[in-house]
């Protein structure tokens, strides 16, 4: 967005998602206010005038503010009452900072998300949904999946004959529609929805349209009438980062309200709406910090609209058109110089005090170095996100601090590969595993100056599981580090799916014995991602999954008391499940019977699924070699195009594009060889045959004479030997 510029307002401390709003002014000539709730529990209201930020009020610290919403009479468009959710309590504060409402709910969980309209307050915890009408508990629902966000339809005429209707964004890749106390239906998505918002602020022309943003960076629109909903459209945004906030407001001057999207990687995107309710990208802006809130209003000027953004680290800033004068009321030059001199003097005085206190602290620490005294360590919060990316076939790990990061040490129990990230402003060094270093991976990321956000990407082979420890050390004295732990599961590349193709060649693995459904659910929780820690209340549970790295093989799990059945068209998946579940049953001393039915046709089926990926990568590498050779030929010949064929001439013309496309593409680093080798080993384990030496044969075939038929022949010969 070239016509927009950033203006910083203030830094208010770390914030949670959805804890900032713009309060509309109650007088025409006054500017709108900004209210933000911090993780320290304090509520701050700010105003902006003459390029100066003023605090209107600030409440006392307390429990972290989990969610913030604006409310008012249902019949009025003006929403200037502030509602704050902390723990299981909701408070109402007016624009002057006076508390006019307080309600302690009966929720057993922390209220993470909130929606307010009129006398209705909707709260959601991790798995619970509650609606309070005039402080009375009117509706409740217990969800079996994690709830990421909630929104309610705001016009009664849109409900029809149904009760109060809310939409939940759930962790099983669905939007669940709740009518009163009951689950009405769900809308199935391809990825996990993380944010929901009413289309155009009120549900659009039908009042039944809801926008959603997913963890994979997709934006969609769904219609939720009574009886069943449908997806109207879904598009990719400019990056695959998680969508953290969606706001509808007319900032471009078009006919309809625009869609403003904030993301985990700091991108702000604006989409304009056409007459068919479809979205088109207008522009983007990057701030390199996690976005936790976006709101709009006349904060700095009554003539133009400000887009107010809040980040995790607490920065409040606006995006406004550059046509606005940067300084509205320019002060007298003499007064301005005096004020600047005063500020310089204050900064120098503070710097002197900081240096004196730092020296005094170091002396105290040295004197108490024997351990008889106590040393103060700085407390800091690590904001991190550890999510599997199907597009990259790897885990994306984001670390963000309020203070600059000095270095991060990665310590892994399993052999993982570190992948390059474009935005990673750090120097990486790895320590090889040896007698002094028992860890399969030990690496450090030393950051450049003033880096508060670090992005990493790690890749693990399917079947490997274990713990990754991160030691995060900020640039403070004395040196201290905070340890965070993440667990990579054996079937980490399997994503939840809504469909299962029964016509594929299937391998079946069944466990029977004296175990409960909760124990079977625990096995699944340790194997697969996005499985709730608690077992859903059902006699029989069925889950479908699809693998994102080997061409799209499927897995279906059906478990109940005393029985767990796994069906997959990939022998590697069946072998991993058999090994991992057997380990857990032995630890728990549960006696089970194992039955395994193999379909040899599934091997050729898996090779067909992975073939397009291998062929594409080999063609890219081949074109890269051709382009390099032709470029060298061109450097030694002025009229090279006179004797080149049309195909070779095109390769030479596309030299730069081919090299750009081939960047990061490698058969060795892609994990394709590991997929084929694991398939060979898994079939050998399940059939009782040796697969020794077959890995080298697979590598030789891919590097010399790969084709689907040759690979199928290699696997067939290995079976017959």
From Swiss-Prot:
Annotated InterPro entries: Bardet-Biedl_syndrome_7_prot, BBS7_GAE_dom, BBS7_hairpin, BBS7_pf_dom, Beta-prop_BBS7, Quinoprotein_ADH-like_sf
Cytoplasm found in the keyword field: yes
Coiled coil, from the record: none
Keywords linked to the UniProt accession: Cell projection, Cilium, Cilium biogenesis/degradation, Cytoplasm, Cytoskeleton, Protein transport, Transport
Tissue-by-tissue expression: Expressed in ciliated cells including amphid and both inner and outer labial neurons of the head and in both phasmid neurons PHA and PHB in the tail at larval stages L1 and L2.
Known partners and oligomeric status: Part of BBSome complex, that contains at least bbs-1, bbs-2, bbs-4, bbs-5, osm-12, bbs-8/ttc-8 and bbs-9. Interacts with bbs-1.
Protein name: BBSome complex member bbs-7
Natural source organism: Caenorhabditis elegans
